[in-house]
Amino acid sequence: DVESRGLGDVYKRQDKYWEFKGNPDYGMKINILPDGCTDFIFTLGEVADIAEQESLIMQPYRSYFVGPMSRYSTLITYAKSIHMFGIRFLPCGLFRFMQLPLEELGNQRISTFESGGIFNDSLAERLCEQPYIQDKIRLIESFLTQALCTNNKIEKQISYAVDCINLSKGQLPIRSLVENVCLCQRHFERKFK
């Protein structure tokens, strides 16, 4: 059925769900490694703030998009209790869900209201009402599946290229990749952005 096919496509594109919840020490630093992945973060209570002064300050009960990270980042806790929940997508895993070019969003944190993505602040509020992590995951997956059904524009060559990259764990030379997807390198680069 459509839902099971949709979830299979969702699972291929996401890396993991994660939750940061607890009572950290005041001023505790959390280092974030650059991994090229993108995240949606739902603040389900107080949050850890970004150390960089020019960055967006995240507010409780909101949702945020974090673009592909290519440099280290640090979060600092200033609250007694923290609760953040997120979904991490593999590189290029969002091309079916967002209309913005991800290359322009590298190393940025923006409100999902500004990103035009599939999630919004009302989802963060609904996630707060879910008592268990599995319930939160089910709610997010229903949003993702619905988005796949409404945005059925599939770039088969790009989807195939992403699968090849993931299968080779990023070790496939570009020349081999463009030959596999039957595109010239320049056209491939334009489509991939």
Residue locations for each model-derived region?
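Compact structured core domains
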Residues: Y72-L172, V181
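Basic/polar phosphate-binding segments, predominantly the helix-turn-helix DNA-binding elements
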Residues: Q171, R175-K193
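Short proline/glycine- and basic residue-enriched helix-capping loop/turn segments at helix->loop/beta transitions
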Residues: Q14
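Single conserved hydrophobic/aromatic residue that forms the stacking wall/gate
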Residues: D1-Y11
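Glycine- and acidic-residue-biased ligand/ion/polar-headgroup-sensing regions
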Residues: D35-D49, P91
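A short beta-loop-beta micro-motif enriched in histidine and acidic residues
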Residues: G27-T38, K80-I82
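Short acidic-glycine-tyrosine-enriched beta hairpin
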Residues: E54-F65
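Conserved short histidine dyad/triad with adjacent acidic residue
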Residues: W18-N31, V66-Y72
